[in-house]
Regions:
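Catalytic core of membrane glycerolipid acyltransferases/transacylases, capturing the structured
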Residues: 1-25
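Conserved phosphate- and dinucleotide-binding cores of soluble alpha/beta proteins
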Residues: 16-137
Length: 137
């Protein structure tokens, strides 16, 4: 399938704890003439269910015979897309969330939102079964 600029809008979920990476990724699409919309990661299911998207792309670092190593949150996106009948595709990235330092606090807009004395769980990568994906780009 071909997604020509000027005819498609890209909805991109911010991706804590790496929200600054989204900005870098979208610059390429904006420069190519795509309209882009950044949504909160909790809005993914709503946007898919409301048929605001025609296809979903999940960034991956590498693939084995059984699964793709995707950026954290990729499993949720793949499950939602499959359940709601929207094609989910794999798209390569050189960003390696398995090696990226996540620290032990959860940030939003660059600020720590973890209360003092608490901990957070921040998975860097998801292993997603290949059966969830329609195509690998």
């Amino acid at each position: 399938m071909h997604y020509p600029s000027g005819q498609w809008t890209i909805w991109c979920a911010e991706s804590r704890p790496f929200e600054t990476v989204v900005s870098e990724r979208l610059k390429v699409f904006i420069a190519a003439g795509y309209e882009t919309v950044v949504i909160g990661d909790n809005m993914i299911g709503f946007c898919i269910a409301q048929k605001k998207v025609n296809a979903v792309f999940v960034f991956y670092q590498h693939v084995t015979n059984e699964h793709a190593c995707c950026q954290g949150g990729g499993l949720l996106v793949a499950v939602l897309a499959k359940e709601l009948g929207v094609a989910c595709n794999l798209y390569p990235t050189d960003f390696d969330s398995e090696k990226a330092a996540t620290g032990d606090s959860l940030c939003f807009a660059g600020h720590n939102i973890t209360p003092l004395g608490s901990h957070s769980y921040i998975p860097g990568a998801d292993r997603v079964a290949l059966s969830y994906f329609k195509e690998r780009w």
